[in-house]
Amino acid sequence: MKDRVLLLGVLILLTACPIGAASVSAKGMEAFEGVCSRADEYGCYVNHRYGYALAWPKRMLRPLGESDAGDGQVFASPDGRAELRCWGSFNETPQQTIPEALAQALAEPGRQVTYRHAAKDFFVLSGYETDRIFYRRSILAHGVLATFELTYEMSLKELFDPVIRDISAGFIIDPAFGLR
């Protein structure tokens, strides 16, 4: 009986954490913990369904609650001048790549993209949408595509530029956070 329980436990661990995807890089976790350790500035949201985590500026934004689907959260400024959204999804087609996800994001209407950068496992877009600035970062890891997007009025650019760096540095996917 003990052998069966042990075997079942090993099978569950192997299924939940495939070899090569056991954890986020130490550098990524260190960056996340570094931002989240600044508790007077940042709150840390962890999405247990998709296993991603995001630091959010708690002096500027308030959480509005996780979506009914459990895929993400919205944080908004009390005056409505800024909003941070994050969401995740399982990569149901393992062939989907960052270039494909980037093309899909670029196809969204009404946006003027002024900056884009793509690498093997992430992309960044920023630009303008009507009278607002947007910054989107998507990461692909462990079979999950996670995205955050910060939008804010142009007059808030100086305030939010350093915040974007912190949010980006601490945005990670790690099976230790959930992946249900």
Task: Describe each model-derived feature in a short phrase.
Residues 8-18:
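Bacterial N-terminal signal peptides
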Residues 24-44:
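N-terminal low-complexity, Pro/Thr/Ser-rich intrinsically disordered segments
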Residues 99-159, 178:
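Signature of long, low-cysteine stretches enriched in small and polar/charged residues
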